[in-house]
Amino acid sequence: MRVNAERLAQDLKGLVGEDHVYTQLFERINYADTSLPYDVEQGDLPDCVVQPADPWEISEVLRYANEHKIPVTTYGSGTSLIFGTKPKHHGITLSTERLTSLEINEDHQWFECGAGIKTGQVIKELGKLGYFLPIQTQIGSSIGGAVSINTLGHLTDNIFGRPVNNVLGLEVVLPTGEIIETGSKCLRRAAGWDLARVFIGSEGILGIITKVRMVLIPMPETVDAVAFFKTVEEIGHAVGMMYREKFPLPMDGEFVGEKACKVGYEAKGLDFPEGAMAITRSMGRDKEDALRNAQEMVRLFKQAGAKEAFILEDPEIAEKVWGVRENAMRWGQEKGLKGYLAIEVNPTLPRLAEAMAELTHITEGRNDLIAQTEAYLYGHVGSDSLHCLFAFPYDWSTEKMKQVVDEIWNLERELQLKYDGVGGDWGWLPHRVPLFREKYGVTSYELIVKMKKLFDPNNILNRGNVEGEV
């Protein structure tokens, strides 16, 4: 229900303090903005934004919202690429930005942090003591957001596992306002029932994660390697060979398609061969161990047909090479294509090269708006996530942009079904609900709907996400 905005703001100020409730249009737009290429519309705006300081204030906000049947949309840092933080029914946007505590307990060998702290800050503080965060998402993303999606970013799943493998426990505020503790404070995770596993990956529909406890992982030694191929398909074959022939997996790795590499090289001042590029980061107990593993990656790449492959010995050059992907978007921008939308496809390993080939030529031979876009391909080596970013003129009308967005999402769904993929990086809700239903069936989807109703009988928390509203 809609409530009087002035009364809502006053009531919330009484719960969290006057300085932490925002009703100005700018703030409401800021907290509703997404990666969509067109402007936020009036129907997407919350009535107000609130920043509680702790789980008790969050509890009070949720109890108030239940009493008045006001929807609450959670907001960590706004880096969601599938629009879970965009309000679907106005109401309250609840930001966890003030939950930034961090305790590193070396005696117990875990760290505990507030859900709103940025991954970049945790990486920095852990690094000072020789530890590593097994979540390598954008440095501006929040820990709570990563855990709620169960994403680890660019890291290889088979090395460190996902957050569900490294989280010892959570503090969670339920949609009805109760605060619960889950998990363990010892290094042994609970066998059998452990409610932490229910909330990890639940994408914010069952409760608000307010605190995360994770195991400490020693910082590994690393060595980087790079290889240049004629096509991305050859990289796909190399990845398949890496697994089948039991090469030591890299802890991190990226590839960039032919089109994007050229601009990336120019931006970074690199004189590298034309074609596609793969870069990997191998780890080891010590530098010698890491170097041996990196040399194995060089051997793999050469065996798979790389034009050139070598160890990146110069740290400055290595930094530039990793930056090639970050600059790849300039390939579209130099053509005046500033609107963009990315998709994610996770093919099975035997069909990885096939999917890469299809995405390389995805705009060709079409009679839709996708045919008018420029597409570039990039992704992860180790975890087979392929991303294709579609760039198009920013002066397209909003209606035209919405049409191409729908076409791109439908394309992603078709490709995921074709290659038996999942939401490996970004999760499911809300815009991948049709994919989930088609992949797993209505019965599986209805189980999630019933869980949501059990935890949130008034459908207060992130209303519209499980329904697939975008």
Regions found by a protein language model. Give the residues of each.
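Activity-critical C-terminal alpha-helical subdomain
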Residues: 178, 428-470
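N-terminal flexible segment immediately upstream of the FAD-binding catalytic core
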Residues: 1-63, 80-109, 260-268, 316-341, ...
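Glycine-rich, histidine-containing beta strand-loop boundary motifs that form or position
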Residues: 74-78, 96, 115, 136-137
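FAD-binding subdomain of flavoenzyme oxidoreductases
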Residues: 100-105, 111-115, 119-252
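A short linear hydrophobic-aromatic micro-motif
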Residues: 71, 132-134, 250-252, 370-377, ...
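N-terminal accessory segments
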Residues: 1-38, 67-71, 300-320, 414-442
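C-terminal substrate-recognition/cap domain of FAD-linked oxidoreductases
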Residues: 25-33, 229, 236-411, 429-430
